[in-house]
């Protein structure tokens, strides 16, 4: 199995890079992990709805170009389903049991995700109604992926 994380925008903060690198290293015991960082579009101040849509479409095209036809896709979206950690672990396990060898997570840019990306997703997932910086969300998501693997192993990490 391979886990892929597609994100829009550059990760700048060293402490976040270090945290993500640590969890990716830990995940190496269980799976191959690939992180794909895509360029974000510049959003002008006071952008019109049409400009925002065009930006979402461009970023969406870049995202979808990195998604395999047979990937199980989980896109982060505020309107997505919320999971307790144990259920999230089961969701990942079920995806592999259904024959998916690659699980791809997507975190959009500052405007979110295009409708085409959301439509392609097998699952929309939410971490709640709170707003998180997209860079911090990467660390939170990678930790939760690691936690899911530890839950599957019956490890006390989750306790």
Curated annotation (Swiss-Prot):
Its main location: cytoplasm. The keyword Transmembrane does not apply. Its EC number is 2.1.1.177. It catalyses: pseudouridine(1915) in 23S rRNA + S-adenosyl-L-methionine = N(3)-methylpseudouridine(1915) in 23S rRNA + S-adenosyl-L-homocysteine + H(+). It holds the Pfam family SPOUT_MTase. It is found in: Cytoplasm. InterPro entries: Alpha/beta_knot_MTases, RlmH-like, tRNA_m1G_MTases_N. S-adenosyl-L-methionine binds at residues 76, 108, 127-132. Keywords: Cytoplasm, Methyltransferase, rRNA processing, S-adenosyl-L-methionine, Transferase. It comes from the Bacteria. GO terms for molecular function: rRNA (pseudouridine-N3-)-methyltransferase activity. GO terms for cellular component: cytoplasm. The keyword Cell inner membrane does not apply. Transmembrane segments: none annotated. PANTHER family: METHYLTRANSFERASE, RIBOSOMAL RNA LARGE SUBUNIT METHYLTRANSFERASE H. Specifically methylates the pseudouridine at position 1915 (m3Psi1915) in 23S rRNA. HAMAP family: 23SrRNA_methyltr_H. Homodimer. This is Ribosomal RNA large subunit methyltransferase H. It comes from Streptococcus thermophilus (strain ATCC BAA-250 / LMG 18311). The gene is rlmH.
